[in-house]
Amino acid sequence: MESTIKNGISHAKKAALLSIIPGIGQLYNRQKIKGCLFLGLSILYVFVFADLFNMGFWGLFTLGTEVPRDNSIFLLAEGLVALIVLSFGLFFYYLNLRDAYKNGEMIDQHLRVNSIKESYHALLAEGYPYLLSSPAFILLVFSVIFPILFSIALAFTNYDLYHSAPANLADWVGLETFKQIFTVDIWRSTFINVFG
């Protein structure tokens, strides 16, 4: 064990630290093809989704600034899509860190690290159910979870007839809409009649 742990830092920890940039930890673990794949996918992810993140998060926080150019509802939807895509990217980033650390542990224990072909066969053998159900999960996220998130987020805006595109923009109002259910007489009586 002394040969693999120098200066108190194990190979696994070094690989995990190097994996802050995806793929570098795999390259450090002598998994060149996997490292290049992770690095390439990460670079593609950043370039492909850079505009979505830029406009999406700007739109999610501001809901637009200029009439009639901005549509608050479209910006809200784009921002939620950016959040979902970011969560998928963070999950990939976690898998990258975990993979580098686990393979670094194998090197610390003087075990042989799997080649790309062996990793592929292990993925098919152990992760086949996840691999097969992942397209359905992605479809589920965008067809079920996204509309629910959109409806919840819309409830915290002042979107109504008087705050709709292209003439006006919606704004974030927090819990003000929910407060009005109990303070506006007609809304309160309707709410009480439905639940009372």
Task: State where each predicted segment sits.
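Hydrophobic side-chain positions on well-ordered alpha-helices
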Residues: 26-27, 181
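Short membrane-interfacial helix/loop motifs at transmembrane-helix boundaries
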Residues: 60-66, 100, 143-185
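Transmembrane helix-loop junctions in multipass membrane proteins, especially transporters and channels
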Residues: 54, 58, 104-111, 156-163
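Juxtamembrane "helix exit" motif at the C-terminal ends of alpha-helical transmembrane segments
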Residues: 44-61
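Generic hydrophobic alpha-helical segments
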Residues: 23-24, 178
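Transmembrane alpha-helix signature in integral membrane proteins
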Residues: 88-93, 183-196
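N-terminal signal-anchor/first transmembrane alpha helix
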Residues: 2-3, 12-14, 19-22, 28, ...
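Helix-boundary and loop/linker segments of multi-pass membrane transporters
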Residues: 8, 121-129, 180-186
